[in-house]
Swiss-Prot record:
Gene: CCDC91
UniProt GO BP: Golgi to lysosome transport; protein transport
Entry comment describing in which tissues the protein is expressed: Widely expressed.
Phosphoserine, modified sites: 43, 46
Keyword tags: Coiled coil, Golgi apparatus, Membrane, Phosphoprotein, Protein transport, Transport
Region of interest (GGA1-binding motif), residue spans: 1-16
Subcellular location: Membrane; Golgi apparatus, trans-Golgi network membrane; Golgi apparatus, trans-Golgi network
A cellular component annotation (GO) from this entry: membrane
InterPro entries in alphabetical order: CCDC91
Name the UniProt record assigns to this protein: Coiled-coil domain-containing protein 91
Annotated region (Disordered), positions in chain: 1-26
Amino acid sequence: MDDDDFGGFEAAETFDGGSGETQTTSPAIPWAAFPAVSGVHLSPSSPEIVLDRDHSSSIGCLSSDAIISSPENTHAANSIVSQTIPKAQIQQSTHTHLDISLFPLGLTDEKSNGTIALVDDSEDPGANVSNIQLQQKISSLEIKLKVSEEEKQRIKQDVESLMEKHNVLEKGFLKEKEQEAISFQDRYKELQEKHKQELEDMRKAGHEALSIIVDEYKALLQSSVKQQVEAIEKQYISAIEKQAHKCEELLNAQHQRLLEMLDTEKELLKEKIKEALIQQSQEQKEILEKCLEEERQRNKEALVSAAKLEKEAVKDAVLKVVEEERKNLEKAHAEERELWKTEHAKDQEKVSQEIQKAIQEQRKISQETVKAAIIEEQKRSEKAVEEAVKRTRDELIEYIKEQKRLDQVIRQRSLSSLELFLSCAQKQLSALIATEPVDIE
């Protein structure tokens, strides 16, 4: 601690003499560990101080800490100073109140050496004794202050050494933590690379499985298309044979009845057949378009729902496969339509040729016999025509029903194959998705 932390203060006390003597200044100079303030006034209610000079020696045992720490110590210092006053002067000042004005003074060389200038009173020998005692007490207090300063410096040195040790330990701890963090980062990178490698292996396996499934699906579609084409060809042949037999029977039964009405009936039948075929073709086209639209919408919805779960590579593969299958189905349907149209045109040409041949033969044979029986046979021919029209309508309805049933079977097969394909893809995607969070954890 520096000397500036303590201030030296002087106070002049005046005492009234009972014999009319001049007022004398007290040689006692109080000293205490006060900060530099303008002035300190003792309260008027402080008790009167009457002390014996014999007790002055016992006050030197006061500790320096008690004097420095609290305002009570300042009062003790004032009491120490007041003990040095001669008893005669203290008795004269019992009824007076102390008004001590303290002024900060600069420290001089004498203060650094532990001495303070005191006001001497040559007339009173007791004042000299009290000054000597004060100097002794001040020297003891200065010694104690020096000791406390040395202790403070020693404590500061201990604190600095402890702080240095703390910094060293903190640096070592931080280095250990950094090394642990680096090891954890290396381990994390290794695990991440392992996880990426496993994901790549799973993706490769998934692509291979998808390629195998696509090949199987293509083979199944080709076999189903071949079977359908063969079945349709057989049905067409059987229907043509049935129609040929029926036409032959009708021609044999009506070769004597038909002459002039055959042309009109033929035209009517042709128109009706054309209308029926047009209606049938339109209905089939509408049904096929509706079915294709429904299948497209279902396929789109299924692909959209599956695409949300799949990754980009799987999405591209599935979409390409679906588009190829759509194109193949459309091509197959177009080929079937073309085949049906060509076969139907051939059948119509054959039927018309046979009808024309039979008509020409019958005309030559029945020109003479038919003219007389035309009126009688008109009613019968009308009834027969109506029955034939009804039969043809029934046969066309049955044929349309069979075609619808076959189309439904084809659609069900294609939808079942698509469902199998999508279920396999979903299972593979779910397996991939289930393995990813486990690897991440």
